[in-house]
């Protein structure tokens, strides 16, 4: 009975890891049809921001230029204007369908992320006792490690998160989150986040070493600085 109770927090942690994937899978299947019908039947105005509107106009201009170029390189004695307009019309309809699919995908992912956040928040709130047990297990495991292993682990983690090559990883991660929530790609915003977020983490980490580790384990701080130097 005691072993069974001891495994309950472990099962709870496993459920937290896989619960977002299950929520995403269920929401994508159940909400996609509803959101698609709502978007297509309502025929609401597209809520474009300045970045998205500029992107749409650029794609329309590129589409028209490609058709004009295609007609110019053809060695026909006379240009069939009606056929040209028909091709433009078909490609425009196809582009509108793709644009609608993009908005449906954006709404679907944003709704799924919001639902996942609400469910996980409630799940974590009702399982505070299990989280407390897991936290005690982690603290006990870290406490039993030697100071050398702790210092090496801290150094490895900081180099991965805020090291010289970390901006490439942050760029991929922030870009994925930015895209998953349906925001339009904006290079300046992404560059700003990539350049400032690791700096903020570095400052917080140095403050944590100065404020917490110096008080709890001064020897760990000495070993960390020795390895880092």
UniProtKB/Swiss-Prot annotation:
State if Transport is listed as a keyword: yes
Q: Which residues cross the membrane?
A: 6-26, 107-127, 189-209
- Pfam families in the record, alphabetically? CemA
This protein's GO cellular component annotations are: chloroplast inner membrane
Subcellular localization: Plastid, Chloroplast inner membrane
Give the record's keywords alphabetically: Antiport, Chloroplast, Hydrogen ion transport, Ion transport, Membrane, Plastid, Plastid inner membrane, Potassium, Potassium transport, Transmembrane, Transmembrane helix, Transport
Mention one GO biological process in which this protein takes part, according to its record: potassium ion transport
Predominant location of this chain? plastid
Q: Which family does it belong to?
A: Belongs to the CemA family.
Q: What is this protein called?
A: Potassium/proton antiporter CemA
Q: Which organism is it from?
A: Arabis hirsuta (Hairy rock-cress)
Task: Provide the organism lineage as a comma list.
Answer: Eukaryota, Viridiplantae, Streptophyta, Embryophyta, Tracheophyta
